[in-house]
Amino acid sequence: MSCVPGRERIKDGFALVARAFIVGRMSIPLGIGRHETLVMMARNLRKMGGDPPMRRVVITGLGMVTPLGCGAEVTWSRLLDGVSGASKVTAFETEDLAARIACSIPLGDGSDGTFNADQWLEPKEQRKVDPFITYAIAAADMALEDAGWHPQSDDDQIATGVLIGSGIGGLEGIVEAGYTLRDRGPRRVSPFFIPGRLINLASGQVSIRHKLRGPNHSVVTACSTGAHAIGDASRIIGFGDADVMVAGGTESPICRIALAGFAACKALSTNFNDEPQRASRPYDVDRDGFVMGEGSGIVVLEELEHAKARGAKIYAEVVGYGMSGDAFHITAPSEDGEGAFRCMTSALKRAGIAPSDIDYINAHGTSTMADTIELGAVERLLGDAAGKVSMSSTKSATGHLLGAAGAIEAIFSTLAIRDNVAPPTLNLDNPERETAIDLVPKVARKRNIDVALSNSFGFGGTNASLVLRRYAD
């Protein structure tokens, strides 16, 4: 498939700013290279009141491995049915841990939505990588298959990139390698220890597997990782550095050290160890922390003209991406919600969409004290339009997938647009306070959804918001 149409638009954009330079509207020093010229032209264009021309980006493929099941449609169906992925942890000893529950991927033979790693990697290959990489490989395979994109030519492979992030990466593998070094000596440390745990190797493995030779990148921004990955990948396409990007997040954090560490931060639910499916309860007065989850969410992003030229199905368009920093605390969000507010505002500005145009918000909503801060920021954003918006936290069903959370929630927002339904916030028995916003308690709500906003906020005050819109020419 030729990528000429999209690249021609970038050339047209270059010609546009070049003409502005020629007629004297821009001042560019002589003796600098093409790249520096483009950068300076872009800066001058902004000063003139415009932005560099951006190509439109659409979502054409979805892939998921989650605590609700393997596959986007299975996961989505169970989410709408109010299924919880939480259960008691049985894979390792938890008696001495404060938090003894998690949202684990259902394992099995691959039927009925269970995950069977053997369907994606040979056992020998599985031993060379951490599960977070295995999950990314599986989700990426599903997304590419869903998109019907299997580049074979040099041009198509070079025009397709990968951007998959993770918040923690191979945490358990690092601990196990430490034990091996201590107990058995350095010669027994596997040569695959490093490449099997590095976060960017999720992107690397997918790139190698599918011969994708475009931008090969990764991102690590705690719980905002998945959203940042999709947002950054959309900009890579928008700026013309690729025509297709495989993007998202992946995580496999459920192990003793992670449960102990997050509990030490007072971030995990510990009051519902005997009732795990009631533990994740965003906005509820009895919430006491998040439930750790695992899995991967991957999307295929595509330049619009490229997707149309090959007849791809289009789920939604990525029209806005905002980022901000709280500069407040290593784990807590700024108490006034200013960072979240600026992040959402930035995403809407980029999208050219007013707050009153939003139909659905997939909240960060982790079932912690920060829920109230996010709610206040959203109310400030929406103003008088709050009463027309539905906002839910799907973490009530999936738990918190950390670096993969923003990616699976972007997929949920995409499917909410496709099916005109807002997924529920489970366990919302007693809202902490009143709000005009519909928090979609317990049961999914059918309603018109043309525009969705997906929020992700992470430790260190790193924030990301994505705006998705129903595709229209």
Enumerate the language-model features and the residues they cover:
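Acyl-CoA/ACP chain-elongation machinery
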Residues: 90, 241-288, 321-335, 363-372, ...
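Active-site-proximal alpha-helical scaffold in enzymes
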Residues: 136-149, 202, 207-210, 215-251, ...
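Condensing-enzyme catalytic core mediating Claisen C-C bond formation in acyl metabolism
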Residues: 56-60, 87-88, 275-353, 360, ...
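Conserved beta-ketoacyl condensing-enzyme motif
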Residues: 59, 80-221, 250-261, 355-372
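ACP-dependent fatty acid/polyketide chain-elongation machinery
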Residues: 42-125, 305-317, 411-425, 469-473
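Glycine-/small-residue-rich "gating" segment that lines the acyl/pantetheine channel
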Residues: 183-190, 228-231, 235, 239, ...
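Phosphate/pyrophosphate-binding loops at sites that engage ATP/ADP/AMP, CoA/4′-phosphopantetheine
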Residues: 143-156, 307-311, 344-360, 381-385
